[in-house]
């Protein structure tokens, strides 16, 4: 199975996708690298995890909506909407006077992230079909460039200027993406898309409430209220009830408009993808959110050193990911490589939990030698 022919339209779309994934990949790394400086400036250390949790809620909700909204808005309009939200959220983050405003800005960014990420994945599938792995390779490189270069730059900005410049960097990236999108990418919809104007409103509401309850327990439990308290019990029961109502709604509604078609749970492939994505998300959160924070807060490193360590990890992740992706596309054995990925993620999490300090010390040693 050869490499697909790249027409001018595909090249423009792939270039746009490269910049888009660079934009959405940079946010987490800028926040985590500048985390200690942000907390020292704005306070609210106990709410550090909420910055990422609230974004996760809005990403999850937006991704569930995107399949329906993109049918109505078109590809370019969906991307433009997401970029404008991302632009606004980063301006808000750059000028945030307190932690509350920063949390709100990350919630907004999650909305933009969800629109952008879903639209990029849909466009690549439509352009490349069975050879979409080559399109994903381009997006992986975009993630890699963002993950390798941004932590170093963010650390340098924090030490020499202010953490707020990291957000202005994201604003500049959004402007570049918007200019490329408006000038080069036509808006289009697919002929086979449904003309139904119905939305799964109940499913959206129940899913938001269920996810919010879960995040509330995990973010504030043991901090704002005790784990074994009435507040925790009420939140847990609320989350369970909302989740049950969500599943019942999705089972009874027309599966063509459901945001979570229950029939998908019968697919072993989709369930395997969900498990793999969960493992990858846990691993990525540990690597890119908490390791830079841990290095600065507990190990006493500088923001630049934490950024350098993150860049080393990101470089290795990108290289091995690209090799596996190319091998998977050529072999067309997706399930085998998916299993390899899940096992690798699990092993990585165990190694991080056991050897976190020695691992980081090795990264710092390389950083010191390079300096």
Regions found by a protein language model. Give the residues of each.
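12-transmembrane solute porter fold
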Residues: 10, 14-23, 31-33, 89, ...
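Structural signature of transmembrane alpha-helices in multi-pass secondary transporters
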Residues: 24, 55, 59, 139-147, ...
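Interfacial helix-cap and linker-helix signal at transmembrane-aqueous boundaries
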Residues: 38-39, 69-70, 156-161, 295-296, ...
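Loop-to-transmembrane helix entry
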Residues: 45-54, 230, 301-313
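Central cavity-lining transmembrane alpha-helices of secondary-active solute carriers
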Residues: 53-67, 311-320
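Helix-loop-helix hairpins in multi-pass membrane proteins, especially solute transporters
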Residues: 63-202
């Amino acid at each position: 199975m050869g490499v697909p022919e790249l027409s001018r339209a595909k090249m423009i779309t792939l270039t746009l996708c490269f910049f888009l994934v660079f934009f959405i990949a940079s946010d987490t790394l800028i926040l985590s690298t500048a985390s200690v400086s942000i907390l020292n400036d704005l306070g609210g250390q106990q709410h550090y995890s909420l910055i990422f949790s609230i974004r996760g809620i809005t990403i999850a909700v937006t991704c569930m909506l995107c399949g329906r909204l993109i049918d109505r808005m078109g590809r370019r309009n969906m991307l433009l909407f997401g970029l404008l939200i991302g632009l606004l959220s980063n301006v808000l983050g750059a000028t945030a006077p307190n932690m509350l405003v920063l949390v709100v800005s990350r919630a907004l960014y999650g909305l933009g992230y969800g629109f952008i990420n879903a639209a990029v994945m849909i466009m690549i599938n439509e352009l490349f079909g069975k050879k979409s792995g080559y399109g994903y390779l381009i997006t992986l490189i975009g993630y890699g460039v963002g993950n390798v270069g941004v932590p170093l730059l963010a650390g340098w900005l924090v030490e020499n200027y202010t953490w707020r410049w990291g957000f202005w960097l994201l604003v500049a990236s959004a402007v570049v993406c918007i200019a490329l999108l408006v000038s080069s990418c036509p808006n289009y919809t697919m002929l086979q898309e449904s003309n139904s104007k119905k939305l799964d409103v109940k499913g959206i509401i129940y899913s938001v409430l269920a996810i919010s309850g879960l995040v509330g327990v995990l973010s504030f439990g043991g901090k704002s209220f005790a784990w074994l308290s009435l507040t925790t019990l009420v939140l847990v029961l609320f989350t369970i009830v909302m989740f049950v109502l969500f599943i019942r709604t999705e089972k009874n509604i027309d599966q063509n408009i459901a945001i979570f078609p229950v029939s998908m749970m019968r697919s072993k492939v989709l369930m395997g993808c969900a498990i793999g994505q969960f493992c990858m998300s846990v691993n990525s959160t540990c690597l890119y959110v908490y390791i830079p924070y841990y290095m600065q807060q507990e190990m006493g490193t500088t923001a630049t050193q934490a950024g350098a360590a993150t860049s080393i990890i990101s470089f290795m992740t990108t290289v091995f990911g690209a090799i596996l992706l190319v091998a998977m596309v050529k072999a067309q054995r997706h399930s085998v490589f998916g299993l390899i990925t899940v096992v690798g993620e699990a092993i990585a999490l165990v190694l991080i939990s056991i050897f976190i300090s020695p691992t980081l010390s090795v990264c710092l040693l390389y950083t010191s030698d390079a300096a």
